Structures are given as C-alpha cells and as structure tokens.
Amino acid sequence: MGFIDEVKLCLKAGDGGDGCASFRREKFVEFGGPNGGNGGKGGNIVFISDANLNTLLHFRYRRHIKADSGKNGAGRDRSGTAGKDVILKVPVGAQIIDEESEEIIVDLDKPGMEFQVAQGGKGGLGNTNFKSSTNKAPRHFTYGQPGEEKHVLLKLKVLSDVGIIGMPNAGKSKFLTRCSNSDTKVGDYPFTTVRPHLGMVKVDDSEVVIADIPGIITDAHLGVGLGHKFLKHIERCQILLHLIDVTHDDVVSAYSCIHNELELYNSDLVEKEEIVVLNKCDLLREAEILEKKNHLANYLNKEVLCLSINGDLQPILRLLSEKLKKSNSKEIDVYDPFKA
C-alpha cells in the first residue's frame, strides 16, 4: 500500500434550498393563506480522526468533495429535506490547514476527534414566515444561502512514542522489524525506507509505538532528499532513538549531521529527550568500539549505548519504556482547540 502524507482538497458544503411562495387552494376557500415551506439546510463537511487509518491514500483520486444541497421548500408548509453531511475519515495526527492563510484549522491528534470544516448554507424562508396582520397574502420568500467553500491542505504527522532517527543505512528499519510486528523493508543500502513505518512493541506490561523515520541527509531542513516530508514526523515523537553506524569513519560527524538538521528545521526538536546508540557493533573489534564510544560520549557529555545487529534489544526497549512512563507522568499543558 502507498503512503501519502499530504494532499490538497477543494471542499464545497451544500447550498441551502430555496423557500417556497405558495397559497392554500381548497374548494370553497376563495382566499387561502400562505403555505410555502422553508428550504432545507445544506450538508456540512466534517472530518473525523480514525485510529485504523495511517495514510491519506484514500484522498488520492478524490480531491474535490461536495456535500448535498438542501431541497427547496414546497406548498402545504412542506420544508425541504436537509442535505446529507459528508463525513471524511483521516488518520490520527492529521492537520487541516487553510491553503490561503496557511493557518491550522484543526489538529486531529487524538482518536475520535470530530471537526466541521465547511458549513452548509441555511435554507431559505417560505412565504408563510412573512404573514402579518397587515400582509395576509405575502408573496415574498428567500433563497437558500450558499455553503462554505474552502481549499485546504491535509498534512499527516505520524504519531509515535519513539522516533528512530539516523543517517541512511544506520540500521533503523532492522531495529524496528526485530522488536515489533512492523513489516519494514530491510536492505544493505541507503534509503531502504522511503516512508515512515510504525511498529507496536510490547515491553513487559506496556506498549510502545515506535516510528522508523526515513534516513536524514545534509540539508534535509531545506527539503533535500524529501527532508521536510520526513522531518515533520519527528515533531510528534516524545523520545528520539538516535542510531549511528559504528563503522562510520567519524561517529561524531555522523551524529552532528542529524543533530544540526533537526535544529535548523525546528530548534524544539533538539530539546527532546534523546538516546544515542552505536549500532552494528558486531562488525568491529571491541577496542575499536570502545574508542568510538568514548569519543562520542565525551563529545556529547552523556552516556552512549552499544548494540549489535542481532543483539538483545530488551535493555534498550525497557529504557525507552521507563523514560516514556516518566514523561507521561509529568503534567503537560496542551492547547485544546475544542475547549472555549
């Protein structure tokens, strides 16, 4: 299945139906009063976040979306039926952005969130509404109002507890494949991963969602190598797991390349908690590994972990789980657009 994380949509809510001007017509009733019904309301366009979706692929050939218009009113005080709402399901983590102003309309970052993006037009009034003591037979009615039309950009930012970052071929995909049920493609060449992958990892009594972010390269913050499409997914991660290929000639340079790109893209990303791991340690002698580990640890002034290609992942997974529990226990003030 393909992965689409951005799509432009043209939304048109339904127009309101027109009101009706009609009069009561019955045998032996010469001057029947007005009985024109109101027009029906136009359908709305509503977005709902669905935890069962993980891509915007279903919008690929559906860029113009229109809700039904309300029906016109009729005689005998019959109101037109309302237009049916259009319900659009999107993955959790989808943002709906106004294409013209570039402002975020809503951020659907929790399952089951519902938000009306385009409102249907009001139905027109039938002539019954204009009857008065001075106007017993009004012929006046109103037309329905047009529904809202909006051009929006849907952006999907993958939601995960942990984001695996690193240069291409650092072993991110294999790590995720080994510790989860993800079917990530693995190969011994750069850019095996061309889209984010999510995996669910069971750690003791906890579940951890881990995202394999495609390899980041120099100038990714400028969009090189689809950098913007990859970097935005890191914004949603609570913890970063930074994998570095221990066989790299300069592990400090390999670390700095990724760190700098994150900072240039969004300085908040480098404030996230980060666990640094030298990967593929079974490919070098112990003395070489220790030298590189100490060199990187001294540069970062923090602990650096080591991992073999087929080594035990449980210590790292338990560390991630513990840090997530601490992070989740902290009280965080989150802006909720659904609260007044």
Curated annotation (Swiss-Prot):
Highest taxon in the source lineage: Bacteria
Annotated Obg domain residues: 1-159
Residue intervals of the OBG-type G domain: 160-329
Coiled coil: none
Protein EC: 3.6.5.-
PROSITE patterns reported in the protein's UniProt record: G_OBG, OBG
Subcellular location: Cytoplasm
Keywords, in A-Z order: Cytoplasm, GTP-binding, Hydrolase, Magnesium, Metal-binding, Nucleotide-binding
UniProt record similarity statement: Belongs to the TRAFAC class OBG-HflX-like GTPase superfamily. OBG GTPase family.
Function of the protein: An essential GTPase which binds GTP, GDP and possibly (p)ppGpp with moderate affinity, with high nucleotide exchange rates and a fairly low GTP hydrolysis rate. Plays a role in control of the cell cycle, stress response, ribosome biogenesis and in those bacteria that undergo differentiation, in morphogenesis control.
Subunit field text: Monomer.
Protein name, UniProt field: GTPase Obg
Originating species: Wolbachia sp. subsp. Drosophila simulans (strain wRi)
